[in-house]
């Protein structure tokens, strides 16, 4: 528990940024549904919603492309994106014509995709090599959903709720800008070492190493294809369910912002706790069970011609949806560690989900409207077969030990058994059950650190501050702090601040 708390405390900025993205994305989607329902029929609301959400894919792709090919354009593009996001939200709020509502939704979702790509990448770089990745993802999603529910249920309808959305969008953009500029400010220092407060896992350090080996590169591609297909099948299930509930919301049968949405908070937190058990080896079977449970709500919508069981269907749907978001956020964050373009992959779960939503929504609305049970059963069987093949086909393949050889535990199922032969050389070790203080004392004794070096290491491994802030806290100059860090690196056999922090948390004392 102590180590988990330390990991979460170090990554609180990344958790908050991702939570703000979840809130603004969900709240923008809800606002668009409300506004577009004023101009079109209930069955058309979800069609327009899927198209608007699909526009976010553009933003999700733009940021990684800029990061790798036009890094000097990121600051200007981010500033423009922030302005466009706020302007689009205001346009969406004040529009009096359907064309303007659609335009506002398209621009807002595209800008949110840009912000979400950054938030997911920062989150993945922080938590991908930690044993609490799923719990961190669950915490972010739960926070975002909780803010949405409280805003919907506590704040007065209209301007107050809309003001909260705009303010949170501005806060999200400001936090992401602040994180990048702090990183650039530190990099300008001649003694700079990559900060754990920034993007602490570099593709050059991990992804490129895997892709230098042809066998590992091929295994990565197979694993990504398998994960993407699984996510597509799952997305189709939940997109069909979302289509049904959005239509019910448009006709006033249910309110998707009301108290049942709190079940998303509970289900996501439960998913995070379950998925992190035993090196995330229960993720696939857990997600499969959640998908089966959620499909029950689809059949409730189909067979309940009298419309009396919408609440029961909504509850079942939300219990599964929380698992799904935590699943694809965690999976792609872990997989990104092995990618050469590591900035590109963390948001791919959301991209696949939105693309599948565009493709599945219209057929799902047709099936639900016709109440065709046979068509629903046929579609469900196809989805279940695909999910079983892609998720449950790996259960006999264990790669936990191999995945642990390069530091902290990674999920076996994140990349499957294919990558096991190509991991690095050291033998796997069992993680010791130590508190942070016990680990620190043992580390200091083993590597012969001085008392001052101990104080510095204690701050270094739990702080998300910049080098300048840490130096100020310890009453040291930057150059003196760098000399101490260099000395600790030399004694521990590490090459950088990031490597030292990762080594500290993965290190196990010898008896």
Ranges and model annotations:
Residues 128-155, 344-364:
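Glycine-rich segments within core transmembrane alpha-helices of 12-TM secondary carriers
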Residues 412-483, 491, 502-511:
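Helix-turn-helix DNA-binding segment
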Residues 53-64, 144, 256-280, 353-361:
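Transmembrane alpha-helices of Major Facilitator/SLC transporters
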Residues 284-324:
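C-terminal transmembrane helical hairpin of 12-TM major facilitator-type secondary transporters
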Residues 113-127, 323-338:
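Intracellular juxtamembrane helix-capping segments at the cytosolic ends
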Residues 99-116, 308-325:
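Hydrophobic core of transmembrane alpha-helices in multi-pass small-molecule transporters
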Residues 1-2, 129-130, 145-232:
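Intracellular loop-helix junctions on the cytosolic face of multi-pass helical membrane proteins
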Residues 2-55, 226-252:
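Helix-loop boundary and gating motifs at the non-cytosolic
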């Amino acid at each position: 528990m102590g180590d988990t708390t330390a990991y979460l405390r170090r990554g609180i900025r990344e958790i908050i940024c991702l939570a703000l993205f979840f809130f603004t994305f969900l709240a923008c989607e809800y606002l668009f549904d409300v506004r577009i329902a004023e101009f079109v029929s209930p069955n058309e609301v979800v069609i327009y919603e899927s198209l608007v959400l699909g526009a976010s894919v553009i933003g999700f792709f733009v940021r990684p492309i800029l990061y790798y090919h036009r890094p000097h354009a990121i600051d200007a593009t981010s500033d423009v994106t922030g302005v466009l996001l706020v302007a689009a939200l205001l346009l969406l709020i004040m529009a009096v014509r359907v064309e303007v509502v659609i335009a506002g939704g398209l621009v807002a979702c595209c800008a949110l995709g840009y912000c979400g790509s950054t938030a997911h990448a920062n989150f993945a770089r922080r938590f991908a090599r930690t044993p609490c990745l799923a719990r961190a993802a669950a915490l972010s999603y739960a926070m975002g959903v909780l803010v949405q529910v409280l805003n919907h249920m506590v704040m007065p309808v209209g301007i107050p709720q809309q003001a909260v959305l705009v303010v949170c969008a501005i806060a999200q953009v400001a936090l992401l800008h602040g994180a990048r500029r702090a990183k650039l400010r530190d990099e300008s220092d001649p003694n700079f070492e990559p900060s754990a407060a920034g993007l602490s896992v570099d593709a050059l350090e991990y992804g490129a190493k895997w892709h230098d080996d042809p066998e590992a590169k091929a295994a990565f591609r197979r694993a990504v294809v398998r994960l993407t297909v699984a996510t597509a099948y799952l997305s189709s299930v939940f997109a069909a369910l979302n289509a049904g509930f959005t239509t019910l919301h448009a006709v006033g049968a249910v309110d998707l912002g009301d108290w049942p949405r709190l079940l998303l908070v509970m289900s996501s937190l439960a998913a995070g706790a379950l998925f992190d058990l035993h090196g995330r080896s229960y993720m696939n079977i857990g997600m499969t069970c959640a998908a089966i449970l959620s499909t029950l709500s689809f059949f409730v919508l189909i067979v309940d011609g009298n419309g009396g069981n919408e609440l029961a269907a909504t509850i079942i749907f939300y219990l599964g949806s929380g698992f799904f978001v935590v699943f694809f956020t965690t999976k792609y964050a872990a997989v990104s560690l092995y990618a050469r373009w590591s900035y590109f992959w963390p948001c791919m779960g959301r991209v696949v989900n939105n693309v599948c939503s565009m493709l599945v929504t219209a057929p799902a609305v047709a099936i639900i409207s016709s109440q065709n049970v046979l068509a629903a059963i046929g579609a469900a069987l196809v989805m279940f077969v695909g999910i079983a093949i892609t998720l449950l086909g790996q259960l006999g393949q264990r790669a936990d030990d191999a995945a642990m050889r390069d530091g902290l535990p990674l999920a076996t199922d994140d990349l499957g058994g294919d990558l096991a032969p190509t991991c690095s050389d050291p033998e796997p070790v069992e993680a010791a059950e130590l508190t942070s203080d016990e680990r620190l004392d043992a580390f200091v004794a083993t590597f012969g650190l001085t008392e001052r070096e101990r104080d510095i290491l204690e701050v270094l491994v739990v702080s998300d501050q910049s080098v300048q802030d840490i130096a100020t806290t310890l009453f040291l100059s930057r150059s003196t702090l760098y000399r101490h860090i260099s000395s600790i690196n030399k004694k521990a056999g590490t090459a950088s601040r990031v490597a030292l922090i990762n080594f500290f948390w993965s290190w196990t004392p010898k008896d």
